[in-house]
């Protein structure tokens, strides 16, 4: 063993190292732990794993009807194909059929009826995927059609809901509206969004002893998959182990939607005793899985001559699809964020969870918050246009204050408010005032091309609104060579969570992050995990890992104090070294001495978010631990002959507290902005009259590409503003808040179109603002301008 020991360093050399700073701890731009493997193709995803011997491939037959009774289901023809092992229907599920994540409503396979085009009716497992597909399509399925509900407005009018409606109220909105100097009503349709993760839904299951299963699943929620697989099989949770090393993207689409392939594979393995794998082709993935919730919004707003809100009522109708899924919490969050940055005063916010015969819509980055924010930003624009004011001035006038006008419609006080100072900084750095005047002059001289400019804020609440989910666990082992093994309950989907959590542990021990190995998220190492969602991954799991690391560090300090007979204050960890009074040791040497001293070098860690609560009956509380802030200023140019547009420039200022990793945080801000911009401009979901999704692949569903980026994109993180709350090293979440920065592009497009009517009217441009919708807005403004001119001419004609 002595041949493998590192060369001994003198005390002078160790002292020099000790005086240097750690280069890979918190606050450093450490590269993503898998970046080289991502670039080289060596990163292992589930479909890259070697197939198990005797493995089966699973394919599901999907419903072709939006709403129908199944009058005949015969899988006998499936067995005519050599290699078919089993054809499954709902009757073959040994345990619980329903896999609804919160409340029932999601059968694994259709049971007597289908409720959307794309619902899984049966599944076939065979030696090859192609054989399974052919066999599944050979099954005989006959239907009796029922009347579908495909439109969210129809569902709202019929009160066709998956869950009860909910209301937030503060003050007297009816009286305030009645007494307001000005009043506007309007409606808005907000489209959904496909997650379009690069890796489609996939699971691979290996049966183990005693009826257990090892499940390799691309999921944001390993514990939920564990629970549902166990319930589908009728076994206890401890028989099921979920292993999740990395996902090829998630964005919320693998929070609940990943469970069905895992459960189907588990049922196949249960019946056959053979391993099974299911990977959805892109088209089937888009047909089966839910999207971001489309919303229909109705509003009634009262305001004064300056644009200050007096009273408001907003009705938010979320298109939930055929089942509840997570729609209760998603519509709740839309309601929570229907204020965005603004003090609503007297407000009534109603949230409706509408049932339609489409795929069950689900979590997506922002989790309903973006839809609520789009609604209030539409209102701010409409108020400003009606008064002939710059929308930014109306926005600033209605911002939450620091010591007054600072209570939300759900009765949480907005603390540590950075909105005004961030807006002022971005106004100055983006030269908003100068560019606004230049754009007005450009538009006056340009009959076809029109420019638009908008600066919009973001105030996003951080925490799961289901309060019990705000907890996390971690597990750390230190080996006698000084290397560290880390597991936590979060899941890596490319966002850099593992890198940040490793940096947290590196900071605690003051060692290089290269010493730390993070392996797959695994339910038999860290149990009872919360989903990696709600921007909470680092906040929760980083804190849990910090807790575990500090527990071990405390043991090491106590041991060193005893062993070297010094006080604990004489012991300091720094840059891979430990100073014990005058003695300096490499970190690994202290670890070895502690091992010989019979000190435990392993620890679990746990964290739960403090201060938060929400009383749903009273519709009040503090659902969010803190708010993350941001602002974006976007400039666009619109061709009024075609409705086409380009993004010219975007300036972003975003609040991440004390950044754990500036490079990763800037990447998240850039990516979030582009994804939000895509949702509001080009990502259009289209269903035909029979409820079939027609945009079910990249040929018909467009996501932003390189050419769609702003020609000039400037991103800055807010400096010297650590999070006042006791988060992990006073950082802030950065997963979801930047998504809403894309709203600035949508508002800028509307600003350009509004110039056609001298900025005195709000164009009716629903989201996404496709060129077709923009052209409709252009024609609306031109007709309005012509009518205004005609009325003016009539007014000056002699009697």
Give a label for each model feature.
Residues 43, 202-207, 296-305, 311-316, ...:
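Short beta-strand elements
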Residues 248-273, 277-279, 497-505:
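Thiamine diphosphate
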Residues 28, 34-41, 167-203, 294-379, ...:
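Glycine-rich loop/linker segments at domain edges
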Residues 4-7, 90-91, 234-239, 269-276, ...:
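C-terminal catalytic domains of large/alpha subunits in multi-subunit enzymes
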Residues 97-102, 135-138, 217, 226-228, ...:
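Short acidic, glycine/serine/threonine-rich loops at helix termini
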Residues 1-165, 183, 271:
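Flexible, low-hydrophobicity surface segments
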Residues 153-233, 399-483, 694-708, 712-717:
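Helix-loop-helix junctions that connect adjacent transmembrane helices in secondary transporters/permeases
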């Amino acid at each position: 063993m002595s041949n493998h020991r590192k060369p001994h360093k003198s005390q002078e050399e160790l002292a020099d190292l000790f005086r240097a700073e750690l280069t890979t701890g918190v606050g450093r731009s450490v590269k993503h732990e898998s970046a080289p493997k991502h670039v080289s193709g060596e990163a292992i995803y589930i479909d890259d794993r070697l197939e198990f011997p005797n493995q089966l491939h699973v394919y599901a037959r999907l419903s072709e009807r939006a709403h129908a009774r199944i009058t005949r289901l015969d899988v006998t023809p499936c067995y005519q194909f050599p290699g078919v092992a089993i054809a499954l229907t709902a009757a073959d599920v040994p345990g619980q059929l329903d896999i609804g994540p919160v409340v029932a409503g999601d059968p694994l396979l259709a049971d007597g009826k289908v409720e959307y085009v794309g619902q899984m009716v049966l599944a076939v497992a065979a030696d090859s995927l192609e054989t399974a597909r052919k066999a599944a399509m050979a099954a005989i399925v006959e239907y009796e059609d029922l009347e579908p509900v495909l439109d969210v407005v129809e569902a709202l009018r019929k009160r066709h809901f998956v869950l009860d409606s909910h209301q937030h109220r503060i003050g007297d909105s009816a009286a305030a509206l009645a007494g307001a100097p000005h009043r506007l009503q309007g409606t808005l349709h907000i489209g959904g969004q496909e997650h379009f993760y690069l890796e489609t839904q996939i699971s691979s299951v290996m049966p183990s002893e005693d009826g257990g299963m090892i499940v390799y699943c691309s999921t944001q929620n390993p514990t939920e998959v564990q629970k549902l697989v166990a319930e589908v099989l009728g076994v206890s949770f401890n028989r099921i182990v979920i292993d999740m090393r990395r996902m090829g993207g998630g964005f919320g689409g693998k929070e609940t939607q990943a469970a069905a392939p895992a459960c189907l594979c588990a049922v196949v393995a249960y019946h056959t005793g053979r391993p099974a794998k299911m990977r959805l082709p892109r088209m089937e993935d888009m047909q089966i899985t839910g999207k971001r919730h489309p919303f229909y919004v109705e509003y009634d707003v009262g305001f004064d001559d300056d644009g200050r809100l007096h009273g408001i009522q907003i009705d938010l109708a979320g298109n939930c699809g055929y089942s509840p899924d997570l729609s209760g919490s998603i519509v709740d969050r839309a309601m929570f964020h229907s204020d965005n940055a603004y003090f609503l005063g007297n407000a009534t916010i109603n949230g409706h969870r509408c049932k339609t015969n489409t795929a069950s819509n689900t979590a997506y980055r922002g989790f309903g918050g973006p839809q609520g924010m789009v609604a209030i930003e539409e209102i701010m624009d409409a108020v400003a246009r009606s008064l002939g004011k710059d929308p930014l001035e109306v926005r600033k006038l209605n911002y939450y204050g620091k010591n007054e006008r600072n209570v939300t419609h759900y009765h949480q006080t907005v603390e540590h408010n950075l909105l005004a100072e961030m807006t002022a900084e971005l106004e100055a750095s983006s030269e908003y005032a100068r560019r606004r005047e230049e754009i007005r002059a450009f538009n006056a001289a340009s009959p076809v091309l029109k420019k638009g400019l908008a600066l919009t804020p973001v105030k996003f609440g951080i925490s799961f609104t289901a309060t019990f989910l705000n907890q996390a666990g971690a597990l750390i082992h230190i080996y006698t060579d000084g290397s560290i093994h880390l597991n936590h309950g979060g899941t890596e989907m490319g966002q850099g969570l593992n890198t940040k959590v490793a940096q947290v542990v590196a900071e605690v021990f003051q060692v290089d992050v290269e010493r730390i190995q993070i392996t797959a998220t695994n339910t038999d190492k860290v149990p009872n995990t919360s989903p990696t969602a709600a921007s909470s991954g680092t906040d929760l799991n980083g804190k849990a890992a910090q807790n575990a690391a500090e527990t071990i560090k405390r043991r090491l300090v106590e041991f060193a104090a005893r062993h070297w007979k010094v006080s604990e204050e004489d012991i300091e960890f720094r840059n891979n070294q430990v100073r014990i009074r005058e003695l300096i040791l490499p970190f690994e040497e202290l670890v070895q001495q502690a091992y010989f001293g019979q000190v435990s070098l392993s620890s679990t860690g746990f964290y739960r978010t403090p201060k938060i609560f929400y009383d749903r009956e009273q519709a009040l509380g503090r659902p969010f631990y803190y708010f993350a802030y941001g602002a974006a200023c976007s400039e666009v140019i619109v061709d009024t002959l075609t409705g086409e547009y380009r993004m010219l420039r975007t300036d972003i200022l975003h609040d991440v507290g004390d950044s754990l990793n500036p490079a990763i945080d800037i990447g998240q801000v850039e990516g979030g902005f582009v994804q939000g911009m895509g949702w509001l401009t080009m990502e259009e979901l289209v269903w035909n009259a029979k409820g079939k999704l027609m945009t079910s692949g990249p040929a018909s569903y467009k996501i932003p590409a390189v050419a769609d980026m702003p020609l000039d994109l400037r991103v800055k993180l807010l400096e010297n503003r650590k999070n006042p709350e006791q988060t992990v090293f006073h950082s802030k979440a950065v997963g979801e808040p930047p998504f809403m920065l894309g709203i600035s592009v949508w508002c800028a497009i509307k600003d350009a179109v509004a110039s056609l009517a001298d900025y005195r009217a709000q164009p009716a441009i629903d989201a996404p603002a496709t060129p077709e919708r923009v052209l409709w807005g252009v024609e609306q403004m031109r007709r309005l301008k012509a009518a205004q001119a005609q009325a003016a001419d009539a007014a000056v004609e002699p009697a």
